[in-house]
């Protein structure tokens, strides 16, 4: 497979599109949220996807799966409304998605959701749009950061695939002692940001566990500000490995939208986030915003301390650093061309796919002998492959030329 997991890209774009995009006043809704227990600790078995945590919950007697998304201000549900949902009167509520489209938001309450032994009542979520078209049943929606601001502290144990949740202040203090950490501040009532120091400048970013598989992302807009200053420009240009035209695809509630832009790939030997040192990061500028994604949690577990407003990192190897070494992350990706789900390639110069003749804009028409005319068909094929196993691709260029290549799945 490609050097970048298709699901990683699609889910990342979805998370960005759903998180922090609503023009909604949620304060009154969140006041009504109640927990069934006090002074509790619970441990829940979860699924880990490229460092992201997918949590099983029970709703209306059925197990569903929600992505724990620190980049989403509030909960979100894909697809249409279901019988168990309690409608909220939100006639004046509008949404504005990442593609500049607007519409009326459909807000509902989850009357009762059970996460492990903890019951959560009256949890408000936003419903609908086209986001679910690109998820293909991988999970049903998001848990937003609003549950943390309601007083829950959690440990995302990505080493043992566990979620530990508690309302006890100081519960994780002993485990967190001496470990790298960073304070977060709430740019909005339920939207945390962290201060990140790069070799050529510093900025606030979202630490977004819903940016599945992503390391550190910059935007051309922010990079342009640093490029105006001579010393910073020299540092950026010295670290730039590639500058090339590429496609940037955003998936919002209204569907997907592709733009052509110039992307820089910048190698950063070190990045500082509080007392955490992130090493060997390869950063793309082809993004709508600056963020740090779930790739960090492929190498470390995470404690979110709601009382201290702090992220604590527990590197799996016992050190105080995280080595990303994510150059392959930017080599090749497959993104939806439009709402139909037809996939087109985004290829970095010098990559294996590039050397084999695949180019940005080529369409994926076949994988392992099966025609590909939608996202979910390809995902089903890919999930049958283990890392290192090869997939036989057939691409078609815009001029009709067919290209047959074999590339192994990398993760």
What is each model feature region?
Residues 1-24:
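Bacterial Sec-dependent N-terminal signal peptides
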Residues 21-411:
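Pepsin/retropepsin-fold aspartyl endopeptidases
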């Amino acid at each position: 497979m490609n050097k970048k997991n298709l699901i990683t890209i699609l889910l990342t774009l979805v998370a960005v599109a759903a998180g922090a995009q609503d023009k909604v006043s949620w304060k009154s809704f969140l006041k009504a949220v109640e927990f069934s227990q006090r002074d509790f600790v619970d441990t829940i078995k979860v699924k880990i996807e490229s460092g992201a945590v997918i949590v099983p919950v029970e709703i209306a007697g059925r197990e569903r799966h929600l992505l724990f998304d620190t980049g989403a201000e509030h909960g979100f549900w894909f697809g249409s409304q279901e019988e168990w949902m309690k409608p909220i009167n939100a006639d004046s509520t509008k949404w504005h998605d990442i593609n500049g489209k607007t519409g009326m938001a459909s807000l509902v309450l989850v009357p009762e959701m059970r996460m492990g032994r903890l019951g959560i009542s009256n949890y408000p979520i936003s419903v609908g749009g086209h986001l679910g078209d690109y998820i293909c049943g991988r999970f049903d929606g998001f848990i937003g950061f609003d549950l943390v601001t309601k007083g829950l502290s959690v440990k995302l144990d990505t080493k043992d695939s566990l979620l530990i949740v508690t309302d006890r202040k100081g519960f994780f203090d002993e485990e967190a002692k001496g470990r790298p950490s960073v304070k977060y501040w709430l740019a909005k009532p339920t939207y945390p940001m962290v201060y990140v120091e790069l070799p050529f400048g510093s900025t606030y970013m979202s630490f977004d566990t819903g940016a599945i598989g992503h390391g550190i992302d910059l935007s051309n807009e922010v990079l342009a500000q640093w490029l105006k200053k001579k010393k910073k420009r020299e540092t950026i240009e010295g670290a730039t490995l590639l500058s090339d035209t590429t496609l940037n695809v955003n998936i919002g509630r209204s569907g997907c939208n592709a733009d052509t832009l110039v992307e820089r790939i910048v190698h950063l030997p070190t990045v500082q986030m509080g007392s955490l040192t992130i090493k060997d990061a390869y950063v793309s500028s082809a993004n709508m915003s600056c963020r740090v994604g779930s790739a960090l949690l492929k190498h470390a577990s995470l404690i979110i301390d709601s009382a201290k407003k702090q992220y604590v990192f527990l590197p799996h190897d016992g050190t105080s650093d995280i080595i990303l070494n994510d150059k392959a992350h930017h080599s090749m990706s497959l993104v939806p061309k439009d709402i139909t789900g037809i996939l087109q390639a985004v290829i970095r110069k010098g990559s294996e796919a590039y050397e084999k003749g695949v180019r940005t804009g080529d369409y994926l028409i076949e994988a392992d002998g099966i025609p590909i005319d939608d996202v979910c068909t390809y995902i089903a094929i890919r999930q049958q492959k283990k890392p290192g196993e090869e997939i036989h691709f057939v691409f078609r260029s815009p001029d009709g030329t067919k290209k047959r290549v074999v590339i192994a799945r990398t993760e």
